[in-house]
Structures are given as C-alpha cells and as structure tokens.
C-alpha cells in the first residue's frame, strides 16, 4: 500500500500538545478574553471538537495552559530550596533561577500580567493553580536554618520575602519596554540583566544577613 493511501493514525498526545502550544501563545499575546476557540484550533491545525474532548471547553484549556506554565516555576522553586542546604546559597540561587526562568518563559510573564489585568478572576475560581504554599513552606525552612545558625537576623516573614524575591526579578521582564526608556537602561541587554540580578542578590542578602 502506498503511503498516500495509508490511514492516518490519530496521536492523542501530539494533538493535545499542539492545542496547548497554540493556546499558550495566543493567550499570552491577547489574554483569555481576546482569543476564541476557533482561533486556537486554526493555529493548532486540529479539529475543533478536540478542544472539548481534551479540555471540555475554552476555560478548561486556559486552566491547563496556566497549570502547565506555572508548574514549571513551582518545580524550579521546590528543587532550588530542596537542594540548597546553605541558606545564603539558597536565597542567591532562587534569585538566579527566577531571572533565568522569566527570561526563558516570556509567556509566564504575559499570562500573569493578563491575570492581574482581569483582577485575578480566573485564579479566584481556581486557587490551586497559583498556590505558593509549597514555596513558602520551603523558604521558611531555609530562613529557619539561617536564623538558627546566626546567619540571618530574626523576624523575617517568608511570605513577604517571597513577594520581594519574585517582584525584584519579575519587573525586569514585565516592564522592560517602559523601564528601558524611563530609566535609560536597555533591559533587553544580557549585560544589564546580569547587573540587575547582581544588584537584586546584594539587596536581598544585605537585608537578611545578621549584622555583627
């Protein structure tokens, strides 16, 4: 039988992955409200019914996009804190990894920005998607080790620290276009981003280290 006459076999994993890739790109560019199911299936090159087969509806597909992107960062957070026995190195490394992740995953920055523009309505309905409880728990352990050994000063709140860690890294990527003009630094430049990372590490550690 010639190849042209052979039946085409459906590959569920490939079809699902194509839908996720297309949806991630479109939701990142236009937000949840700016994208239709028709546009997603056209970009993915699959039948429309596949969306409802794998994800039930547009909301289910969007939830899976967020879960897929956010879980990658959660894995990095968990691995970083678990592998860093030295508290100072743990804090330094999570900042390095945040900068790296945000630079490598612009869709994460865009999706989170869109969710904030929507007042987090979707996250309110699916709070487990963006829960930082595991990261807070792991960061608390790092801080406790630092305080017990006298490296960090007492009274550091892990929730506020996590917000600071994320914020310092996030703004270099989320606001790079506007800040590049307003402060006169090219935030697209790898050299400038390295300077920003070094500055963020120094700033955080100077605030955590116990003064002698």
Regions found by a protein language model. Name each.
Residues 2, 65-94, 123-124, 130, ...:
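Amphipathic alpha-helical linker/stalk segments
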Residues 104-125, 176-183:
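Amphipathic alpha-helical segments used for helix-helix packing
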Residues 1-3, 97-100, 104, 133-149, ...:
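C-terminal peripheral helix-coil segments that are non-catalytic and often amphipathic
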Residues 19-27, 98, 204:
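Short hydrophobic clusters on alpha-helical segments that form packing/core surfaces
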Residues 79-110, 131, 158-162, 194-197:
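Hydrophobic alpha-helical connector segments
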Residues 18, 26-60, 64-65:
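Helix-turn-helix
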Residues 29-33, 84, 105, 149:
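Short coil/turn segments at alpha/beta junctions that flank glycine-rich nucleotide-binding fingerprints
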Residues 15-23, 40, 65-69, 73, ...:
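Generic hydrophobic, amphipathic alpha-helix propensity
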């Amino acid at each position: 039988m010639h190849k042209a006459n052979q039946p085409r076999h459906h590959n569920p994993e490939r079809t699902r992955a194509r839908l996720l890739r297309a949806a991630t790109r479109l939701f990142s560019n236009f937000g949840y409200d700016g994208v239709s199911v028709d546009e997603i299936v056209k970009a993915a090159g699959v039948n429309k019914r596949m969306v409802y087969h794998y994800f039930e509806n547009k909301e289910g597909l969007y939830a899976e996009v967020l879960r897929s992107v956010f879980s990658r960062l959660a894995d990095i957070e968990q691995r970083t804190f678990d592998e860093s026995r030295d508290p100072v190195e743990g804090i330094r490394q999570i900042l390095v990894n945040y900068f790296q992740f945000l630079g490598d995953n612009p869709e994460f920055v865009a999706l989170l920005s869109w969710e904030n523009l929507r007042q987090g309505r979707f996250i309110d309905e699916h709070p487990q998607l963006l829960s930082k409880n595991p990261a807070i728990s792991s960061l608390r352990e790092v801080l406790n080790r630092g305080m017990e050994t006298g490296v960090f000063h007492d009274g550091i709140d892990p929730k506020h620290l996590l917000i600071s860690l994320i914020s310092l890294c996030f703004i270099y990527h989320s606001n790079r276009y506007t800040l590049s003009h307003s402060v006169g630094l090219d935030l697209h430049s790898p050299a400038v981003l390295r300077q920003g990372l070094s500055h963020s590490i120094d700033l955080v550690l100077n605030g955590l280290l116990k003064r002698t």
